[in-house]
Amino acid sequence: MARVTVYDIAEKAGVSTATVSFAFRHPDKVKDDTKARILRISEELGYVPSGNARGLARGRTGTLGIYAFDMLLERPQGSGLEEDRPDASSATVNASVDDDEPDVLAYPLYVDEVLRGFELECWKSGKGILMGAASKKDDHRSVTDIAGCVDGLALMPSGYNDMLPLSMLAKTIPLVMVGVGDEKLPAAYLQCDNASGIRQIVDHLVEVHHINDMAFVGDVNGGGACASGTDTDDVVSRYDAFKKYLEERGLDSRGALLDDSFATSDEYLVSVCEAIESNRLPQALVCGTDQTAFDVIRLLVDSGIRVPEDVIVTGFDGILAGRLMTPHLTTIRQPMEELGRRAARMLLSRNGKPWEKPEKLILPVRLVVRGSCGCG
């Protein structure tokens, strides 16, 4: 069967080839109904726009791709990423000017560790790697470009994944969805055991610290625009497990969700702020990710609230930064490097052939107790 081209899509959709190209590369310039029609027809015909269509024609590229949400792309203007610094080439730097110093608590270390595992496994197998990243404000063109150049693609999407033509890609190359629990596509789904992690946290808080009043903080709606908005389906899964396990233990779950105000930076953690102002904080805050926990602890400390003496805070992920902050963060450690390795192995096992049905793999997690809960 001949490879489907942009001309085939344009003819069936009744539009110009330029409109088809714009639908993938500049979707904001195409009417919603036209864009939806083009994407639907592309999916039906198995068309994948590519920056390297020759790779698809060859059938094999010897390269695997990984596409990740990078929260650094969400940082505001003037954060040191976009602007030239006048002292960048100076022999002497003013020690008081440190706004270009990297903030270890603000880096997507979860993504970094997964990427490292993916890279190591590809290196071990003699495969090349093509990486891509986007913020939530970006469209899907970079994903489809990468997909056309690789034999398989791992994705670490967050709240914007519904914008991606994933159903179309899943019919063309093998996909591994990292941190996604909703098995809608014929692809591999790779997650840590979120439910087990939450149970371990709750058990520790109840049995060791005698806590019976706790609440969850996390972007359960997906797609938060805050600086820590790296949350994915994992956070939704963790919240669901949290609420369910509170009920199983006979604890009040009516106030299980304290804060999901992650839609914009102006609204970020507004419910936590309100709880501080009204003096109605629970005994413990269980955060959906370590990065959310960092921001919560900063907010509490800046408000004169001691952690863990006044309020216990826990995270989830186990990134390195949790050991560098004060107090050290009690968290659930998930095997991030192993997630990357497994993603690469799963893609390698397919030899470029897409999955015919969903396949799921869940990796175990463990509790790490430190100072933010009063241990260690």
Residue locations for each model-derived region?
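Central regulatory/effector-binding core of bacterial HTH transcription factors
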Residues: 106-108, 115-156
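N-terminal helix-turn-helix/winged-helix DNA-binding helices
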Residues: 2-4, 43-106
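N-terminal helix-turn-helix DNA-binding module of bacterial transcription factors
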Residues: 1-63
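Bacterial carbohydrate/catabolite-sensing allosteric modules
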Residues: 44, 94-100, 113-128, 152, ...
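Short beta->alpha connector loops
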Residues: 47, 134-139, 156-162, 291
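Redox-cofactor binding/interface segments in oxidoreductases and associated redox assembly factors
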Residues: 66, 155, 287
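Active-site-adjacent beta->alpha loops and helix N-cap segments on the catalytic face
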Residues: 162-170
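Short acidic active-site motifs
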Residues: 138-142, 163-164, 267, 271
